[in-house]
């Protein structure tokens, strides 16, 4: 006989008759604001107690949400999922693919916002080309050209104080989109050019799409009742992206391989999905890593020392160069630990399941709050401290710190505690886990490594403003303008 407790007794905010818990988000006061879900998660974490779970039941148009605040529990759920794991739906995107533009997508709805057999069938066609390590490694030289062009553009958009413009996050969107075009479509989209007509249309679509997503996917679904202005902007952007993917298919890139076997439509649908999930996420990761390094002179100097040793200034980088940059990779991991681009991943469980000692019914949506776990002391000692060394292997640490560990006592203490604690494999999952993890993970990592290597090899980057705050859009992005200050390293003495 099961000793699990009844689901009814799982802690959580009490739903009201008829309207359930939806009223909390409808009113929109802390801690129940869709753009401040980080605050909501910390509130629920306090409710859960040590290693427990919390439910938010009876949300209008949504299944019950269950939040297990335990890396061990997260591991159990992930490891027992079936061959076709179900993620939370993106209702508006699903509507676009499966209803509004069904004549185009038909039986090939893609990977995003799709579940079950259609998702599994499409994934089987495209996964080999995306997951194979050699595919992303082969793309490094072309991505390096994009990174070089973007860093050159950064120099051009600096003001008289050598400060980047307030819309620098949009510039990072352009870089990310140009990068996806390079490796997925095998072409340059022109996003980094000032007067390219296609590029202007693309950027307009980027603005329209990313401003529409949080309103449509996180707020009350008014678009189901009538075509709101935001809904129209969203659909126009998706149509434009779809046309772009068909128009820009070439005989190069990952999608060209797919087209040879499965046809241009499958290749274009894959390209569309890659654009939808590979632009704002990668741009946000780049922004956060720049911010943490700009605020941490010690880590920035360590990174620059590694770059000076392993990457000649004018060299076109390849995958072997990236292999020699463990500290750069640790800097990115540490940034994504503190500020993951997605606060949590989810699964819609397909059978009754015991979670944190409670019987959870089939159909519930389990949300894995990685943002909370990766910022807790029990998994990461001194979690608010930016310490890339915690991700390094023992043999890499002494060189990265320029000296024996005892030289920097604070960092050494954090590293030793982390070594004793270990890093739980399910405490920080910025790319997800399992068959539904980010399918473009290797490409995104290469994009980030190349861009950040170029920036910090060339510049000292500083931040002269206060602490950045973040919002959920649904990507976790900074609110304030990213006005970094850049100085050429060869024109300014190193500290």
Put a short name on every predicted segment.
Residues 23-52, 243, 247, 316-356, ...:
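Conserved cytochrome P450 K-helix E-x-x-R motif and the immediately C-terminal K′/meander segment
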Residues 1-103, 117-121, 144-149, 346, ...:
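N-terminal membrane-proximal hinge/A-helix region immediately C-terminal to the signal-anchor transmembrane segment
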Residues 88-99, 137-286, 302, 473:
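Cytochrome P450 heme-thiolate monooxygenase catalytic core
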Residues 299, 366, 428, 441-477:
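Cytochrome P450 heme-binding "Cys pocket" and the immediately downstream C-terminal segment
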Residues 281-293, 451:
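Short, small-residue alpha-helix embedded
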Residues 394-448:
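Cytochrome P450 heme-thiolate "Cys pocket" and heme-binding signature region
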Residues 255, 475-495:
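C-terminal helix/juxtamembrane-tail motif
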Residues 83, 368-418:
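Conserved cytochrome P450 K-helix/beta-meander segment immediately N-terminal to the heme-binding cysteine loop
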């Amino acid at each position: 006989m099961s000793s699990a407790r009844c689901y009814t007794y799982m802690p959580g905010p009490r739903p009201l008759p008829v309207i359930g818990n939806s009223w909390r988000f409808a009113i929109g006061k802390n801690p129940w604001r869709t753009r401040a879900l980080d605050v909501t998660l910390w509130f629920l974490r306090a409710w859960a107690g040590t290693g427990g779970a919390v439910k938010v039941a009876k949300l209008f148009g949504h299944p019950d949400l269950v939040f297990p605040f335990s890396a061990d529990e997260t591991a159990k759920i992930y490891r027992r999922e079936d061959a076709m794991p179900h993620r939370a739906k993106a209702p508006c995107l699903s509507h676009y693919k499966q209803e509004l533009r069904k004549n185009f997508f038909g039986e090939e709805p893609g990977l995003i916002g799709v579940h079950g057999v259609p998702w599994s069938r499409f994934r089987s066609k495209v996964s080999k080309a995306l997951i194979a390590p050699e595919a992303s490694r082969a793309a490094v030289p072309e991505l390096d050209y994009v990174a070089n062009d973007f860093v050159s553009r950064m120099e051009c958009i600096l003001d008289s104080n050598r400060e980047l413009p307030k819309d620098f996050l949009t510039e990072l969107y352009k870089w990310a989109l140009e990068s996806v075009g390079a490796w997925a479509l095998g072409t340059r989209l022109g996003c980094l050019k000032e007067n390219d007509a296609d590029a202007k249309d693309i950027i307009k679509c980027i603005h329209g799409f990313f401003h529409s997503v949080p309103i449509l996917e996180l707020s009350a679904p008014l678009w189901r009742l009538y075509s709101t202005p935001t809904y129209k902007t969203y659909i126009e952007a998706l149509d434009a992206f779809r046309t772009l993917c068909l128009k820009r298919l070439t005989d190069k890139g990952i999608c060209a391989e797919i087209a040879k076997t499965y046809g241009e439509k499958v290749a274009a649908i894959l390209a569309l999905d890659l654009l939808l999930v590979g632009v704002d996420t990668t741009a946000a990761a780049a922004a956060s890593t720049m911010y943490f390094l700009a605020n941490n002179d010690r880590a920035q100097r360590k990174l620059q020392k590694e770059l000076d040793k392993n990457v000649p200034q004018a060299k076109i980088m390849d995958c072997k160069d990236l292999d020699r940059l463990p500290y750069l990779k640790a800097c990115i991991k540490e940034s994504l630990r503190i500020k993951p681009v997605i606060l949590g991943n989810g699964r819609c469980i397909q059978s009754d399941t015991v979670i944190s000692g409670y019987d959870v019914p089939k159909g519930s949506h389990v949300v894995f709050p990685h943002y909370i776990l990766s910022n807790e002391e029990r998994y990461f000692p001194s979690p608010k401290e930016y310490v890339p060394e915690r991700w390094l292997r023992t043999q890499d640490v002494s060189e990265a710190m320029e000296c024996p560990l005892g030289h920097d006592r604070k960092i050494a203490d954090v590293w030793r505690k982390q070594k004793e604690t270990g890093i739980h494999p399910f405490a920080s999952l910025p790319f997800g886990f399992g068959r539904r993890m980010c399918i473009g993970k290797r490409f995104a990592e290469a994009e980030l490594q190349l861009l950040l290597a170029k920036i910090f090899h060339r510049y000292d980057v500083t931040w002269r403003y206060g602490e950045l705050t973040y919002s959920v859009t649904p990507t976790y992005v900074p609110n304030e303008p990213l006005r970094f200050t850049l100085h050429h390293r060869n024109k300014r003495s190193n500290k």
